[in-house]
């Protein structure tokens, strides 16, 4: 990102439109739940009684409707935090077409995959905020963006080594050596495709929400299986973990104002105009008061992992760029995440200060080589929005997973959806012997449970 581009994009006089006056606004997409929940019984709405923390109905796919790999899914709406369930989910088969160099093909989404195509699978969770629109758009769009990005690099993915020139030309005899020295492999092309797909999807959401005068954003957690590897891409505070008999491995990191403090402070240091004189970029252990003026107090800036002391000046009394701790930390007093999709129109309350310049849509991607795992029958990946992780730790989830799968009917294709439902029940305040006193999550909760064993020995299709 160049400084010139950034200034044109975000600083005064840039292309972001001013907030529109209040009035009736039509959503760019109708509200709906994931398509694979059709026929599951419960309607999207819920009565007041069913929105109580301990009485909210948990939804999962109807029996007879299976997801890729017999993966399990379950969800529950929030306890009257918002009118709608702002989470969304998507899953399906990815069909990546190989094409001859120079042939331009249409962009229609394919549902039938001839054997000569590279195929994979896709699971995604989107946790919306400021309304459900951004999450719905992401669920409808991101897989198509990813397919296009993968098709742009598929010839490099299937080559023994990605060529310097996709056309196959060798302009410089040392080109293969340069690629080898950089350590570029097929998985790097998949990672790049995921990063570009997130950015493309973010642009689409921005255009759609701007056209309808809407605001809103969402986090995105995606798992993609291609060529024997599982790619987990995360932008936000959802989480994925691998649960095995004797191992728990976290496959994603949460991106919050706290975890990305230095990046956010660096941006405010480079472009102080973004704070409009209303915020201080410095971090202090607590919000400073007038009595702190002239005193030396603990602080840290963008270049610091540790702490030091400074004498408090009047400008230090402004509201902090990042305020609060843990789940309560907020960026510009507004947003609890630092990465995600959307939020192009989001401003600090009663100001023209934009949050989008501080947000990244680019995910962190973790690669799990499934074929190198010696996968056992009860090995699963659990993906969930933050409503689950607010009340259950990785260890508690792993304990529940192992307890459920031991002795449960192994030939039941819906047992992983039952497992996902059980995990959600453990966020509804019900005491469970495995986890102790039941805690309550008032948030929307969505969970995928992806079994690895059935695919561990299966090669990717071409």
UniProtKB/Swiss-Prot annotation:
Residues that, per the record, bind Mn(2+) 1: 127-128
Cofactor remark: Binds 2 magnesium or manganese ions per subunit.
UniProt-listed Enzyme Commission number(s): 3.1.3.16
Keyword terms of this UniProt record: Hydrolase, Magnesium, Manganese, Metal-binding, Nucleus, Protein phosphatase
Start and end residues of each PPM-type phosphatase domain: 100-452
Signal peptide limits: none
Residues covered by region (Disordered): 1-66
GO molecular function annotation: manganese ion binding; phosphoprotein phosphatase activity; protein serine/threonine phosphatase activity
Catalysis: reaction(s): O-phospho-L-seryl-[protein] + H2O = L-seryl-[protein] + phosphate; O-phospho-L-threonyl-[protein] + H2O = L-threonyl-[protein] + phosphate
Cofactor: Mg(2+); Mn(2+)
Tissue-level expression: Widely expressed with highest levels in testis and lower levels in lung, kidney and brain.
Gene3D superfamilies: PPM-type phosphatase domain
Start-end of Basic residues biased regions: 1-10
Protein name, entry field: Protein phosphatase 1M
């Amino acid at each position: 990102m160049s400084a010139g581009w950034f200034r044109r994009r975000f600083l005064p006089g840039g292309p972001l439109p001013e907030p529109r006056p209040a009035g009736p606004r039509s959503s760019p997409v109708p509200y709906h739940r994931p398509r694979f929940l059709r026929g599951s019984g419960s309607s999207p709405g819920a009565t007041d009684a069913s929105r109580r923390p301990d009485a909210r109905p948990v939804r999962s796919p109807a029996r007879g409707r299976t997801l890729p790999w017999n993966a399990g899914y379950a969800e529950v709406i929030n306890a009257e935090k918002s009118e709608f369930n702002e989470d969304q989910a998507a899953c399906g088969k990815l069909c990546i077409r190989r094409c001859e160099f120079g042939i331009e093909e249409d962009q229609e989404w394919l549902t039938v995959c001839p054997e000569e195509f590279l195929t994979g699978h896709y699971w995604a969770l989107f946790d919306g905020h400021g309304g459900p629109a951004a999450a719905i758009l992401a669920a409808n769009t991101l897989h198509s963006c990813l397919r296009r990005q993968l098709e742009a690099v598929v010839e490099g993915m299937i080559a023994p080594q990605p060529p310097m020139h996709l056309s196959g030309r060798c302009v410089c005899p040392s080109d293969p050596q340069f690629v080898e020295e950089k350590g570029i492999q097929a998985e790097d092309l998949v990672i790049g495709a995921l990063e570009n797909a997130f950015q493309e999807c973010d642009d689409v959401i921005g255009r759609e929400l701007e056209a309808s005068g809407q605001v809103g954003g969402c986090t995105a957690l995606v798992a993609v299986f291609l060529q024997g590897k599982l790619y987990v891409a995360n932008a936000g505070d959802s989480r994925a973990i691998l649960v095995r008999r004797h191992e728990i491995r976290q496959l994603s990191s949460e991106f919050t104002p706290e975890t990305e403090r230095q990046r956010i402070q660096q941006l405010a240091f480079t472009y102080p105009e973004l704070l409009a004189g209303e915020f201080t970029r410095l971090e202090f252990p607590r919000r400073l008061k007038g009595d702190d003026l002239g005193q030396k107090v603990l602080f840290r800036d963008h270049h610091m992992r540790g702490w030091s002391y400074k004498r408090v000046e009047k400008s230090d009394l402004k509201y902090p760029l990042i305020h609060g701790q843990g789940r309560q930390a907020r960026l510009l007093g507004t947003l609890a995440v630092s990465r995600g999709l959307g939020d192009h129109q989001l401003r600090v309350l009663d100001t023209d200060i934009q949050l989008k310049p501080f947000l990244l849509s680019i995910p962190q991607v973790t690669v799990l080589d499934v074929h190198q795992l010696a996968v056992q029958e009860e090995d699963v990946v659990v993906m969930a929005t933050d409503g689950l992780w607010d009340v259950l730790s990785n260890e508690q989830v792993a304990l529940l997973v192992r307890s459920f799968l031991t002795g449960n009917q192994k030939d039941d294709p819906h047992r992983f959806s039952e497992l996902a439902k059980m995990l959600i029940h453990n966020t509804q305040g019900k005491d469970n012997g495995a986890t102790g006193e039941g805690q309550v999550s008032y948030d929307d909760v969505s969970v995928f449970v992806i079994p690895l064993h059935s695919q561990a020995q299966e090669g990717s299709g071409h």
